[in-house]
């Protein structure tokens, strides 16, 4: 079992490479999907150069766990919170490292109604599953879908 040091008390943040990469992003998505079993969630990412590739890997993990993914594309954390609540989906994940240096990236996770997921509300469980990396085989009949959407007009209004 690999210890993932990118898991912090309230979110996920790590230096790109060994602490956070596409494989780890996939495992986080898969763990989120297997633990919370959401039907549909929204994802997005900030302007960092690595956010898009991490978001793609994250979405793949979610879909492999049977979760339908709505990708709002370039976004801020507050837009993920808005979209999660506005669309009435089961959760959301923003790929962002906030104020950390450019060689870092991370994720902020929420449940339904945009309730933040932190150490005492599910983040440790997601971490454990991602570290164990012992997921069931992907069932093609159960695999989730990916759809690109925009909530920018509704968010701005």
From Swiss-Prot:
Q: Detail which positions bind Mg(2+).
A: 98
Q: How is the cofactor bound?
A: Binds 1 Mg(2+) ion per subunit.
Name the chemical reaction catalysed here. Answer: alpha-D-mannose 1-phosphate = D-mannose 6-phosphate
List cofactor names only: Mg(2+)
GO process annotations (BP):
capsule polysaccharide biosynthetic process; GDP-mannose biosynthetic process; lipopolysaccharide biosynthetic process
SUPFAM superfamilies cross-referenced by the UniProt entry = Phosphoglucomutase, first 3 domains
Q: Pfam families from the entry?
A: PGM_PMM_I
TM region(s), chain numbering: none
Q: Which segments does the entry list as coiled coil?
A: none
Name the source's superkingdom. Answer: Bacteria
Instruction: Write down the EC number.
Output: 5.4.2.8
Name the pathway it acts in.
Nucleotide-sugar biosynthesis; GDP-alpha-D-mannose biosynthesis; alpha-D-mannose 1-phosphate from D-fructose 6-phosphate: step 2/2; Capsule biogenesis; capsule polysaccharide biosynthesis
Which UniProt keywords are listed? Capsule biogenesis/degradation, Isomerase, Lipopolysaccharide biosynthesis, Magnesium, Metal-binding, Phosphoprotein
Which PROSITE patterns does this entry report, sorted A to Z?
A: PGM_PMM (PS00710)
Annotated S-S bridges: none
- Kindly identify the residues recorded as the active site: 98 (phosphoserine intermediate)
**GO MF terms held by the record:** magnesium ion binding; phosphomannomutase activity
Protein function: Involved in the biosynthesis of the K2 capsular polysaccharide biosynthesis.
- Family the UniProt entry places it in: Belongs to the phosphohexose mutase family.
The record ties this protein, via PANTHER family, to: PHOSPHOMANNOMUTASE
What name does this protein carry?
Answer: Phosphomannomutase
Organism for this UniProt entry: Klebsiella pneumoniae
